[in-house]
Curated annotation (Swiss-Prot):
InterPro entries on file: GcvPA (IPR023010), GDC-P_N (IPR049315), PyrdxlP-dep_Trfase (IPR015424), PyrdxlP-dep_Trfase_major (IPR015421), PyrdxlP-dep_Trfase_small (IPR015422)
EC number, as in UniProt: 1.4.4.2
Family, as annotated: Belongs to the GcvP family. N-terminal subunit subfamily.
Swiss-Prot/TrEMBL catalytic activity: N(6)-[(R)-lipoyl]-L-lysyl-[glycine-cleavage complex H protein] + glycine + H(+) = N(6)-[(R)-S(8)-aminomethyldihydrolipoyl]-L-lysyl-[glycine-cleavage complex H protein] + CO2
Keyword Oxidoreductase attributed: yes
An example Gene Ontology molecular-function term: glycine dehydrogenase (decarboxylating) activity
Complexes and interactors: The glycine cleavage system is composed of four proteins: P, T, L and H. In this organism, the P 'protein' is a heterodimer of two subunits.
Pfam family, one: GDC-P
EC class of the enzyme, as a word: oxidoreductase
Stated role: The glycine cleavage system catalyzes the degradation of glycine. The P protein binds the alpha-amino group of glycine through its pyridoxal phosphate cofactor; CO(2) is released and the remaining methylamine moiety is then transferred to the lipoamide cofactor of the H protein.
Entry protein name: Probable glycine dehydrogenase (decarboxylating) subunit 1
Length: 443
């Protein structure tokens, strides 16, 4: 049966109310020569026919490829229990838990998520999430601008180009000055970043590991920023925070991340999760929901949304953002994933991913003309210079069922021969060996 939202009788009643005889009368102001004579719309199909057509379209997707794509989004193992638990009816909603008396389960889950990401980052305050890693970076910049009353922002070019494009778009009409400091062959130029930070700067924004996979320590940079009354903002890879120096240890004021690696499948680009944490001093500047723990009149532990005067449903004109229910369901996936994996499991995931990546780097750099882009330490992702176009290598290997990495020529000038390769615990040594042999056969 077709789904018809309005019956002929209902349409007739609506036309009578507005005083016209037919639907065509609604378009009478359009000159006849501009009105379409007909619409090139195919005949309707039955439900079975629609399903068959969609299946034929879906069959064009390649799901059998062994992929070494990363660039901020990684194919980590997700315990099967995550899907089962997050799909429970008590949780499966986008509703914001304004009513604590009816939302204790959801509020406690958000509180536990905030606690977990604060421990992971070694920061003091977390919100209930924002949309993704890029929006988290933007919100961090806005926090810095509000807190310092300054408009200059220093951006490391080794920050994800996806994020940098978003920042340029979001700030294009906000009278903010974005100063981009060039990278040095894939490494962050910390001295140049320090030179760019002055008493007019609101924040310096970096990433660790950076887009090229290089791991760094920004403690000195953040100390310098603090001496200029500017803030230190860092974007991180959540899984690798289990083995790397944390934002809190470096002295960052705001730490953000894309939480995709904590239980979110790649899913053609989303939905993902924006993680935001900060120091207690900036708690009233952070956007979005914050769940807090308290005691009720009977002395029982309860959970509520707190510091709500920051939010648009309380002070619309002066709100820190227009974030509403945001990615609460994705945040729930993240906390379930972290609880099922545990601290030791997260460390093991990072170690296995690093082990695979370093094996892949050794195999690939043994090929003639192939070298690492930089000599910085790396975790599970690294950039290679090839003796041929990286795009050509990818195009040819896809025909063999392998995506060997992410070509960087479209994002960085002079890098048509650079390939970004990422490994996770899901890649076997055998798969990596086959990929290396295929690359070698095309050089």
């Amino acid at each position: 049966m077709p789904y018809t939202p309005h019956t002929p009788e209902e349409i007739r009643q609506m036309l009578d109310v507005i005083g016209v005889k037919s639907i065509d009368d609604l378009f009478a102001e359009i000159p006849p020569e501009m009105q379409p004579r007909s619409f090139d719309i195919p005949e309707g199909m039955s439900e079975m026919e629609v399903c068959a057509r969609i299946q034929r379209m879906a069959a064009k997707n390649r799901i059998d490829l062994v992929s070494y794509l990363g660039a901020g989004f990684y194919d980590h193992h997700i315990p099967k229990a995550v899907d089962n638990l997050v799909s429970r009816g008590e949780f499966y909603t986008a509703y914001t838990p304004y009513q604590p008396e009816a939302s204790q389960g959801t509020l406690q889950a958000i509180f536990e998520y905030q606690t977990a990401v604060c421990r992971l980052m070694e920061m003091e305050v977390a919100n209930a999430s924002v949309y993704d890693g890029g929006s988290a970076i933007f919100e961090a910049m806005m926090m810095a601008a509000r807190a310092t009353r300054r408009s200059k922002l220093v951006i490391d070019e080794a920050l994800s180009p996806i994020y940098r494009t978003m920042l340029a778009s979001y700030t294009s009409n906000l009278n903010m000055e974005l100063v981009t400091v060039a990278h040095n062959e894939g490494r962050s130029d910390k001295q140049a970043l320090m030179d760019a930070v002055d008493d007019k700067c609101a924040a310096v924004v970096v990433q660790n590991p950076n887009f090229f996979g290089a791991v760094d320590d920004f403690t000195e940079l953040f100390t310098h920023a603090r001496s200029c009354n500017a803030l230190g903002v860092i974007s991180v890879y959540p899984v690798m925070q289990s083995v790397l120096k944390t934002p809190g240890e470096m002295g960052a004021d705001i730490a953000v991340a894309d939480g995709q690696s904590l239980g979110m499948p790649l899913s053609f680009g989303g939905p993902y999760l924006g993680i935001m944490t900060c120091t207690k001093k900036l708690a009233r500047q952070i956007p979005g929901r914050i769940a807090g723990r308290t005691k009720d009149v009977d002395g029982k532990t309860g959970y509520v949304l707190t510091l709500q005067a920051r939010e648009q449903h309380i002070r619309r004109a002066k709100a820190t953002s227009n974030i509403c229910s945001n990615q609460a369901l994705c945040a729930l996936r993240a906390i379930i994933h972290m609880c099922l994996t545990g601290p030791e499991g997260l460390v093991r995931t990072a170690e296995l991913s690093m082990e695979r990546a370093h094996y892949a780097a050794d195999r690939l750099t043994a090929l003639p003309g192939v070298s690492l882009l930089h000599d910085a330490p790396f975790c599970n992702e690294f950039a290679l210079r090839l003796p041929v176009s990286a795009y050509d290598v990818v195009d040819r290997l896809v025909n063999h069922g392998v995506v060997p990495g992410f070509p960087l020529g479209g994002y960085y000038a002079g890098m048509d021969d650079v390939l970004l390769v990422a490994c996770t615990e899901k890649h076997s040594f055998e798969q990596i060996g086959i990929m290396a042999e295929l690359v070698g056969g095309m050089l």
